[in-house]
UniProtKB/Swiss-Prot annotation:
GO annotation terms (biological process): defense response to bacterium; defense response to fungus; killing of cells of another organism
Protein name stated in the entry: Perinerin
Function noted in UniProt: Antibacterial activity against both Gram-negative and Gram-positive bacteria. Antifungal activity against P.heliothis.
Keywords in alphabetical order: Antibiotic, Antimicrobial, Fungicide
Lineage: superkingdom: Eukaryota
Source organism of this protein record: Perinereis aibuhitensis (Korean lugworm)
């Protein structure tokens, strides 16, 4: 769980992260705001999307 969260916050775009772990994403969204997520994630490593 922790490993996945770490990897996701580095290398996954917001869309995929939301799909992988909705509850964690919602918590983080409230904590730091959605813009932060959307801004920083250009290259997505997730097999769901591959930006």
């Amino acid at each position: 769980f922790n490993k996945l969260k770490q990897g996701s916050s580095k290398r996954t775009c917001a869309k995929c992260f939301r799909k992988i772990m909705p509850s964690v994403h919602e918590l983080d969204e409230r904590r730091r705001g959605a813009n932060r997520w959307a801004a920083g994630f250009r290259k997505c490593v997730s097999s769901i999307c591959r930006y």
